[in-house]
């Protein structure tokens, strides 16, 4: 990624050789507050959500880990893969690259803060489908990005909320005052230093864990883990 952002008179420059990112997929039309009510209907609520997503960048490859589980820890949806790196957009093949290594059996081992559901440490793993090789991913947490800042669970600037033709606003929070037990702060991304088989890279671990989740003894809607 390259370009710049300006906020309250301070300009931030981004160099493509130093700035890594992930472009999310298009989700099509969604029935969001105040906007177009068409689109796929919402799924019936099953009493909880356990979601982990980790796009990870290394010098010579990328890794992708995405997992939805139900309250008992049963897999609802998963994607795991090791992917090649391209030098430019023009180098993209236009079809799925045959060198992509698809994975299954996504695993996780999480530990949480003592007073909230914020992940403090994590180990992930997945198994290559063709070879059966188990890929272990080690993480070192650097800091936490609040998804509320881009509209998720925000009461006024909700993600995709219709605000008429033009609406501009800004907001600031003192991160030291953030309440990690509040509902609107449960959806976060942790910037991580990551390692796979001696390769060191950078990426994020996104978490959204709501409702009970038996494997980690989580109860209630957003109740912290039991001590």
Task: Report the location of each language-model feature.
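Structured soluble/peripheral alpha/beta segments that form catalytic or ligand/cofactor-binding pockets
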Residues: 1-227
């Amino acid at each position: 990624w390259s370009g710049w952002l300006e906020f309250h008179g301070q300009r931030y420059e981004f160099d493509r050789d130093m700035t890594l990112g992930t472009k999310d997929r298009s989700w099509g039309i969604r029935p969001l507050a105040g906007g177009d009510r068409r689109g796929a209907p919402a799924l019936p609520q099953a009493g909880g959500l356990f979601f982990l997503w980790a796009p990870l960048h290394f010098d010579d490859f990328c890794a992708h880990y995405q997992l939805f589980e139900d309250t008992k820890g049963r897999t609802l949806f998963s994607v795991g893969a090791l992917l090649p790196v391209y030098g430019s957009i023009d180098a993209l093949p236009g079809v799925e690259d045959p060198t992509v290594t698809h994975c299954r059996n996504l695993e996780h081992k999480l530990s949480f803060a003592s007073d909230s559901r914020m992940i403090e440490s994590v180990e992930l793993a997945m198994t290559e489908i063709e070879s059966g090789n188990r890929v272990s991913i080690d993480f070192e947490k650097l800091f936490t990005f609040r998804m509320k800042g881009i509209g998720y669970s925000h009461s006024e600037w909700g993600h995709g909320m219709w605000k008429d033709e033009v609406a501009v606003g800004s907001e600031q929070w003192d991160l030291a005052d953030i309440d990690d037990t509040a509902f609107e702060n449960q959806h976060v991304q942790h910037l991580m230093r990551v390692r796979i088989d001696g390769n060191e890279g950078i990426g994020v671990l996104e978490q959204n864990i709501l409702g009970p989740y038996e494997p980690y003894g989580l109860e209630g809607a957003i109740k912290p883990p039991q001590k």
